[in-house]
Design a protein with these regions (language model features):
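A sequence-level detector of short linear motifs
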Residues: 25, 46-47, 84, 103
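Tryptophan-paired
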Residues: 26-78
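Extracytoplasmic electrostatic interaction patches
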Residues: 63-124
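A residue-level signal for beta-strand positions that form part of recognition/binding surfaces
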Residues: 11, 34, 120
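Short amphipathic, basic-aromatic surface patches that mediate peripheral association
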Residues: 16-26
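Short, basic/low-complexity N-terminal boundary segments at the transition from targeting/disordered tails
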Residues: 16-18, 50-51, 87
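Bacterial Sec-dependent N-terminal signal peptides
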Residues: 1-13
């Protein structure tokens, strides 16, 4: 019975930086109001909630809960508005525990690097 043990999916963690690698939330350039994330479902776009953690990183909790491939649109209100899409592929965990896992995340139209489960996004 899967209900006794359940593993929630890991969140997507993004750190928004400039070309020097400086965290733009930490240095005060960007705040929560500068970000918008939308889940793309056919012709519909649905706002997706996120938070900013104590390490000045954007945390998206929802993507891993959806099995299959889900595309999101991100809007970052920097001096030049940045639009980019990212696609999350998630699958069910195998074994006796229920839950999902994120298999991979791919970014389009933006420079992104993955390190230790954190996606560093270069926006200026």
């Amino acid at each position: 019975d899967d209900s006794d043990c359940f593993t929630p999916p890991e969140p997507i963690v993004m750190e928004f930086v400039n070309s020097k690698g400086e965290n733009l939330i930490q240095n005060g350039t960007l705040t929560k109001e500068h970000f918008h994330f939308l889940q793309i479902a056919g012709d519909t776009k649905i706002g997706t909630s996120f938070e900013i953690n104590h390490e000045s990183r954007v945390i998206l909790n929802k993507p891993g809960w959806i099995v299959g491939s889900t595309t999101y649109e991100a809007l970052v209100l920097t001096k030049e508005i940045k639009f980019f899409n990212f696609t999350v592929n998630a699958s069910k965990l195998s074994g006796k525990c229920g839950g999902n896992k994120i298999d991979n995340v791919s970014f389009e139209d933006i420079e992104a690097h993955s390190q230790n489960g954190i996606y560093q996004i270069v926006v200026e």
